[in-house]
Amino acid sequence: MQNDQGEIVDVYIPRKCSATNNILAAKDHASVQINMAEIDPQTGRMTGKQITYALCGELRRMGEADDSVNRLAMKDKMLSEVFGH
């Protein structure tokens, strides 16, 4: 398919799980997408930076979603390292 500038683009780009890197199937109704916003410590307001994490249903079913979000947030410096220990 071509866009209005004549560039070839894909119609569908599948999402991947941020923790396991598995492709999220269309029928994976247990998968979720979480947006985390950075907060300014002085004002308590959002700075405008946000990161999106997609988690597959298999990860949630195993009960590993919370650990995965914490690990991803620490890697992206959205959560302090002290929280992990």
Swiss-Prot record:
Q: Is Zinc-finger among this UniProt entry's keywords?
A: no
| Highest taxon above the source species | Eukaryota
Q: Which UniProt keywords apply?
A: Cytoplasm, Endoplasmic reticulum, Ribonucleoprotein, Ribosomal protein
Q: Name one GO biological process term.
A: translation
Q: Where in the cell is it found?
A: Cytoplasm, Cytosol; Cytoplasm; Rough endoplasmic reticulum
Predominantly, its location class is cytoplasm
Q: Which GO terms describe its cellular component?
A: cytosol; ribonucleoprotein complex; ribosome; rough endoplasmic reticulum
- Give the Gene Ontology MF terms in alphabetical order: structural constituent of ribosome
Subunit architecture: Component of the 40S small ribosomal subunit.
Q: Which family does it belong to?
A: Belongs to the eukaryotic ribosomal protein eS21 family.
The protein here is known as: Small ribosomal subunit protein eS21
Which gene is transcribed and translated to give this protein?
Answer: rps-21
